[in-house]
């Protein structure tokens, strides 16, 4: 049943850690909704900046947000002007003191979320789905991935009936908990409807004692 479960959630506490790191008792649901609001806002606001992951850490009335992106320059802006504007917007949204930490994703070809978004973008630009999948698989393997699987689901190529097609190269061990598997999901909004794109990238095994 390894293919039915989210590979990131499956490995939490084993080789992966949580994207939200804070503790609360009475305010738990309020802070959880605030996290969702922050993530949705940042995803929309930084749509063209290639954001892969957003981590949130909290302490008292402060929040530290780590943004992992393929294009840090776009978020930081000239002399940090953009990042200051973003900080003010987030502070207004949450009524909290916000610290932003922008981290660069050095190899976007090995980041499942960025690969999924790239395939979705190509599908929106009417690139043939098989070509888009194959191109992403080839470039990920070239940059050192041990295995990759891309699944596209929907009205592929404008077909009357929706279907699911996938393409895999290398190993993608879904049951092995020590396997470092990255997972990403994106949606392509085409004229025929929405096409879902799922990407699984196997980067190697994490041995005990390593993180």
Curated annotation (Swiss-Prot):
Residues 38-106 form the KH type-2 domain. NCBIfam families: rpsC_bact. Keywords: Ribonucleoprotein, Ribosomal protein, RNA-binding, rRNA-binding. Coiled coil: none annotated. InterPro entries: KH_dom, KH_dom-like_a/b, KH_dom_type_2, KH_sf_prok-type, Ribosomal_S3_C_sf, Ribosomal_uS3_bac-typ, Ribosomal_uS3_C, Ribosomal_uS3_CS. HAMAP family: Ribosomal_uS3_B. This is Small ribosomal subunit protein uS3. One of its GO terms (molecular function) is mRNA binding. Part of the 30S ribosomal subunit. Forms a tight complex with proteins S10 and S14. GO terms for biological process: translation.
């Amino acid at each position: 049943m390894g293919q039915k479960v989210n590979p990131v959630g499956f490995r939490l506490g084993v080789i992966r850690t949580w994207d939200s790191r804070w503790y609360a008792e009475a305010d738990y649901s309020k802070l959880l909704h605030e996290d969702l609001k922050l993530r949705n806002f940042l995803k929309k606001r930084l749509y063209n900046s290639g954001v892969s992951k957003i981590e949130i850490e909290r302490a008292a009335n402060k929040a530290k947000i780590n943004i992992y992106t393929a294009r840090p320059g776009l978020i930081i802006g000239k002399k940090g002007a953009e990042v200051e504007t973003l900080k003010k917007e987030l502070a207004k949204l949450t009524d909290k003191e916000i610290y932003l930490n922008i981290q660069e994703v050095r190899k976007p070809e090995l980041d499942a979320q960025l690969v999924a978004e790239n395939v979705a973008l190509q599908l929106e630009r009417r690139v043939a789905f098989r070509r888009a999948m194959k191109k992403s698989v080839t470039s990920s393997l070239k940059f050192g991935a041990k295995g990759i699987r891309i699944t596209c689901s929907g009205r592929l190529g404008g077909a009357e009936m929706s279907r699911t097609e996938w393409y895999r190269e290398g190993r993608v061990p879904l049951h092995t908990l020590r396997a470092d598997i990255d997972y990403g999901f994106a949606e392509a909004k085409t004229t025929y409807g929405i096409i879902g794109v799922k990407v699984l990238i196997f980067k190697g095994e994490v041995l005990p004692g390593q993180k």
